[in-house]
Amino acid sequence: MPNILFVDGRNLMSKMSFILNPERVKEKKVDFAEYDFNSLLNKVLAGISVDKKLFYLGKLTVHEETTKKSKELIEEQRLLKVHLEAQGFEVVLAGHVRGHKETCPKGHETLTFKEKGVDVRIAVDMITLACQKAISMAIVASSDSDLQSAVRELRSQGVERIYLGFETQPNKGLSFTTNRTILIRNSEVEEFSCKQSASD
């Protein structure tokens, strides 16, 4: 039975963005369509055989209030998907990402995009594979607490479980429900960093 890596893409990239661009400088936005995810994960998972790598992303749709930004994000995701597939990942588009306008207390409108349903798809896929006896080990690259119930179910199905998180604010609940915890160091994220986009 295979060892499978489940990557919660938005969760992973959000954590990495904070490490690579902690001040949230717009001109230094990280271009993940150039990031060497494969080398990073090969390093932190050294000694562990990974037979399949699943990278989950929220499915983007164009919303009438956010048409321009939605189309930009869809193109960014297309480039990211091509980049990930070239590195041996199977990209799974799940749930949805919707843009909407929020008004702050001062009356300013902000365009916000929220992802929903990806964690549900990861949980369903893990449990389905476990019930089919089609998985030996699940490596969970996500710090989403909503996955704890699914990970507990994997335990009852006899599946080995590894939580892959970050040294900054690891998820204690996922650490508790897995056999092993591997934490990615900030220096390792930086080691395989893509060129940050700059508008010089």
Q: Model segments located where?
A:
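Domain-level signal for Mg2+-assisted phosphodiester chemistry and nucleotide/NA-binding surfaces
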Residues: 1-111, 160, 165
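Nuclease catalytic cores that cleave nucleic-acid phosphodiester bonds
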Residues: 89-200
